[in-house]
Amino acid sequence: MLNVLIVGASGYSGAELVNYINRHMFSKIKKIFVSENSSHIGKLFSELHQEFKNIIDLPFEAINYDTLIEKDIDAVFLATDHHVSYSLVPFFLSLNCVVFDLSGAYRVKNTDTYLKYYGFSHQHQDILKRSVYGLAEWNKQEIKKAELIAVPGCYATCIQLALKPLIKENFLNDEFIPIINAISGVSGAGRKANITNSFCEVSLHPYNVFTHRHTPEIIEHLGIPVIFIPHLGSFSRGILASITCKLKCNFTFQDIYNLYNTVYKEKPLIRVYEKNFPSIKAVVKLPFCDIGFIIQDKYIVIIAAEDNLLKGAAAQAIQCFNIRFGFSEIESII
């Protein structure tokens, strides 16, 4: 039985992690943490997330280095802002814990990215070099040996899963930059209240065009340039991405369908559509990334959908956890 800490357990993704680990056959939650200024300190998890009453009644504890030092901790999940994870990762690695970081603090190797997109200078370059990018379907062998797994961003996950097979097999015309329009529910902005994600204020609008933090992440890990246009939608959870590309040759629908099926046939959390398109309704509260597409002449439009809190965050983190410790990839997820 593996002992697990979860930091940032009051947030949306953190709560999903608590749920997954609680029902995991081979792991046990030792403690759950929130920030030192949180109003939830001392409250039960089930007070904040009432659906877990009499199921998960653990108390929230404040983050500080004294309480974080626990004996016999095997793994730590950080569902925290990047500046918190940035500081905590070295600490937990020094305690020989395997760390699963859901923030953007260690996802990208190019240190210039952190100054430009995150506003800080990355000083833990030795750790950054050792971090493994946790795109579970593509980096399984690296994840098996990693001590720090940087769980990909929500947008970055579904976009890469949709594009990587085409890039790997050199199906795309290099002269045409993929154009990505993706819509996320407001839970992607976190749990803290602000005017941006207020129900009465959100309609459907683009944001952070050319400046979104997932842009350099997508570009670095795909290895090609893209134009990424994120949108905020007036729904709670889920991401739908529409990706327009140009193919190198006159590939048929069956050619592309066979490619996706070949690449993902052993990947239980990827569902490839032969008919119709994915929808947010089909993936909300489920751990899947659904992929569909249509071709006209040499153009292909790929539609990818996922739950941003699950396959885009907690479910993928648990998937990486399972891979790292040799469990079934879908243990506690399905």
From Swiss-Prot:
**Record's keyword terms, sorted:** Amino-acid biosynthesis, Arginine biosynthesis, Cytoplasm, NADP, Oxidoreductase
Question: Could you tell me which species this protein originates from?
Answer: Buchnera aphidicola subsp. Schizaphis graminum (strain Sg)
Stored PANTHER family: N-ACETYL-GAMMA-GLUTAMYL-PHOSPHATE REDUCTASE, CHLOROPLASTIC-RELATED (PTHR32338:SF10), N-ACETYL-GAMMA-GLUTAMYL-PHOSPHATE REDUCTASE, CHLOROPLASTIC-RELATED-RELATED (PTHR32338)
EC number(s) in its UniProt entry? 1.2.1.38
| Name of the featured protein | N-acetyl-gamma-glutamyl-phosphate reductase
Which CDD domains would you find in this protein's record?
A: AGPR_1_C, AGPR_1_N
Q: Where does the record place the catalytic residues?
A: C154
The record's section on Pfam families has:
Semialdhyde_dh, Semialdhyde_dhC_1
